[in-house]
Curated annotation (Swiss-Prot):
Organism this protein belongs to: Methanoculleus marisnigri (strain ATCC 35101 / DSM 1498 / JR1)
Chemical reaction(s) catalysed: RNA(n) + a ribonucleoside 5'-triphosphate = RNA(n+1) + diphosphate
Protein name: DNA-directed RNA polymerase subunit Rpo10
Organism placement in taxonomy: Archaea, Methanobacteriati, Methanobacteriota, Stenosarchaea group, Methanomicrobia
Chain ranges passing through the membrane: none
Gene it is expressed from: rpo10
Gene Ontology cellular component annotations, sorted alphabetically: cytoplasm; DNA-directed RNA polymerase complex
GO biological process: DNA-templated transcription
Cofactor-binding details, from the entry: Binds 1 zinc ion.
Matches recorded under Pfam families: RNA_pol_N (PF01194)
């Protein structure tokens, strides 16, 4: 689950997650993707760069 907003500045970042993930999985440079998506602040960029999907890891413990 990607956070809806940046923890630091509050900008909406969840709208960029799907395209970022698809393009990164295709092997494109993350810097270029984030630039194309208009994420200029480093706080917003780190929200996508450092995100790890953990929902599937936690499901067995419910």
């Amino acid at each position: 689950m990607i956070p809806v907003r940046c923890f630091t500045c509050g900008k909406v970042v969840s709208t960029a997650w799907k395209e970022f993930k698809e393009r990164r999985d295709a092997g494109e440079d993350p810097k270029r993707i984030l630039d194309d998506l208009g994420l200029e602040r480093y706080c917003c960029r780190r929200m996508l760069l450092t995100h790890k999907e953990t929902v599937e890891d936690l499901n067995p413990y419910q």
